């Protein structure tokens, strides 16, 4: 029982900013603090890359607290994402008058980046790629990831695009990125059930151990509180990632990109400051696909044939 009380106390301590046990209230709080964060950026209280001031906002302060406790659960190697099991694609809008595009045309160039991207402002040469599990037999003329890449470009009828596969450069394969999709295919009920199963197992083992010591007339050892740390941290990280995905990662209208994307760009600066090489995030416009943004555009390169697509 002491071990269980320790677990409950530790759970409350880790949830001191957001009460993760009350989902509806937490969702409202995240939406509210995110809106405040965005408004502060829109009012130029600090720049997107001014982390010292940004960390005084409630949203980023909480994000930092949660991140410091469980960042290892979000870490993935670039080679784990850009591998043979995943189909990785980039789409580039081209003009009808252009000559046949080459690999260089598929790479980001500052002079061509005139609008905000989700995690970077104009002229920043970060590499955005779409990916999904590789399909042996695509159901249509375009694979899932190709459709995702075109959706991310907001392709409309009459436009022309080049599509090309990408793969990781070997020297970057072990670099770490932060995966914000860890709870994408998991429900809140499943996240909670896993926590309860893990803590129940620990409690049973601790109780069994105490009974054995009692029967042997020995003084039972102090309950190992540390055993609860991993399941609790895992629960918080999955719950928080799920809340972010459901409440924050939403489609953005092109008319207000600079305002709506500013807090994401600040988050990216935070993750970059921690030494990571990119971010994995779910597509808000094509749920079957995912995206990765790499802070060094040379971390991956085009490969294979370039396909030209006319949007009808």
What is the role of each PLM region?
Residues 1-121, 133, 156-312:
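Active-site and NAD+-binding cores of ADP-ribose-processing enzymes
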Residues 122-143:
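A short, exposed loop/beta-hairpin motif centered on an aromatic-Gly-Thr core
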Residues 143-147, 261:
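Conserved structured core elements
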Residues 146-156:
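Short active-site loop/helix that positions an aromatic residue
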């Amino acid at each position: 029982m002491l071990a269980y009380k320790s677990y409950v106390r530790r759970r409350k301590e880790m949830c001191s900013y957001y009460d993760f046990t009350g989902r509806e209230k937490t969702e409202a709080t995240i939406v509210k603090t995110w809106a405040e964060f965005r408004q502060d950026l829109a009012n130029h209280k600090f720049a997107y890359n001014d982390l010292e001031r940004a960390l005084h906002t409630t949203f980023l302060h909480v994000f930092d607290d949660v991140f410091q406790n469980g960042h290892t659960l979000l870490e993935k190697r670039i080679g784990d994402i850009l591998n043979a099991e995943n189909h990785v694609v980039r789409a580039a809008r081209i003009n009808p008058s252009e000559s046949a595009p080459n690999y260089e045309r598929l790479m980001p160039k500052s002079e061509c980046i005139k609008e905000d991207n989700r995690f970077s402002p104009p002229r920043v040469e970060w590499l955005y790629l779409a990916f999904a599990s590789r399909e042996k037999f695509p159901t249509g003329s375009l694979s899932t990831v190709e459709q995702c890449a075109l959706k991310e470009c907001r392709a409309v009828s009459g436009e022309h695009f080049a599509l090309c596969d990408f793969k990781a450069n070997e020297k970057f394969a072990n670099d770490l990125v932060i995966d914000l999709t860890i709870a994408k295919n998991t429900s809140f009920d499943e996240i909670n059930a896993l926590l309860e199963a893990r803590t129940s197992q620990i409690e049973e083992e601790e109780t069994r151990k105490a009974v054995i010591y009692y029967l042997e007339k020995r003084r039972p050892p102090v309950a190992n509180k540390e055993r609860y740390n991993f399941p609790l941290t895992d629960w918080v990280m999955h719950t928080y990632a799920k809340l972010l995905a459901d409440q924050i990662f939403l489609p953005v209208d092109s008319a207000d990109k600079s305002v709506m994307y500013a807090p994401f760009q600040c988050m990216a600066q935070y993750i970059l400051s921690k030494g990571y090489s990119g971010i994995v995030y779910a597509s808000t416009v094509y749920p079957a696909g995912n995206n990765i943004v790499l802070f060094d555009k040379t971390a991956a390169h085009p490969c294979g044939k370039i396909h030209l697509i006319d949007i009808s």
